[in-house]
From Swiss-Prot:
GO BP field: tRNA wobble uridine modification
UniProt protein name: tRNA 2-selenouridine synthase
Family matches, as InterPro entries: Rhodanese-like_dom (IPR001763), Rhodanese-like_dom_sf (IPR036873), SelU (IPR017582)
SMART domains to which the protein is assigned, alphabetical: RHOD (SM00450)
Entry keyword annotation includes Chaperone: no
Organism: Photobacterium profundum (strain SS9)
Amino acid sequence: MLMPRQNCEVFRQLFVNDTPLMDMRAPIEFAQGAFPTSINHPLMEDEERKAVGTCYKAHGQDAAIALGHQLVNGDIKAARLAQWKAFAEENPNGYLYCFRGGLRSRITQQWLKEAGIDYPMVVGGYKALRRFLIETIDTVAQQPMTIVGGNTGSGKTIMVNELANGIDLEGAANHRGSSFGRYVTAQRTQIDFENVLAVEMLKKQAQGCTHFVFEDEGRAIGSASVPLSINAAMGNADVAIVDDPLDVRIDRLIDDYVVRMQRDYIAQNGEQQGWELFTEYLERGMFGIRKRLGMKRYEELLAAQKQAIATQKSNGTLAEHDNWLRPLLIEYYDPMYTYQLSKKADRIVFRGNYQEVKSWLADK
């Protein structure tokens, strides 16, 4: 039997402790943005919510509530209640929420109570939780930070994940920010990106972090935008530069963009389709920068890429990927980053190889 608990009005520990959350909103609302530990078990499905909303506008709250009870009744109500009971019993430390902590939360609580379960809700609902996370991001933006920069393949993302005070923007966005930046899984929505980012910040704060390290990023990471307050703070922060040799950087890129992506596509889609999707992924990445390469050079590097993939598929060797990655770095990515870095020259406070920069940042 679940012991009665108070409704939740203090949100920090909810996120720091990865507290399970049951989201009562409709699937369309959930898809637009939710929280890392939330599961959608809606009171109403999309069409039901739409019908109730239309009724509310035309006839008022009482009529809308009556329609809601009519739509969610009998077997439908029993099935949803069974889902909620299972969640509550599996997650005795969890909470439920709707958009504002209003009618949907109270009805769910009431039905659960009638079934013998006293389950608490989040006061203020999704809206209050979301506001708290946005405020967290803005608070971190006001704290000391250092940016780790360096040419493509310098291991910046690896480094921020290895540092106790590192914040992985690309991980939060589920995108690596370049033309080749997508993962096998879909990129997060803007809201989900911000929510995941804020939760990571809360956890770092709980560990005592007061100085944060971010990877040098532009405003856009794939289709996501770095929150304005963080982007502005990064634009004024000290910069530490990783200067690693070209061969080391190419090895990292082969591991990240070739070995990992091929493995992940096959794991998700099977051997044949996995190879097809992996090939399409690399070719789309090259296609995305064709105008900057110029069509002649694009076609040459695409041919080298296709040959490297064919050899990899034939005998498992990876060496031929050097034939397109090396010129891509020398001719495109390195000059582009050199130009971007020239605008930050007055903020560079440290340079070194990967281990030197990591050790220096670890003392922050």
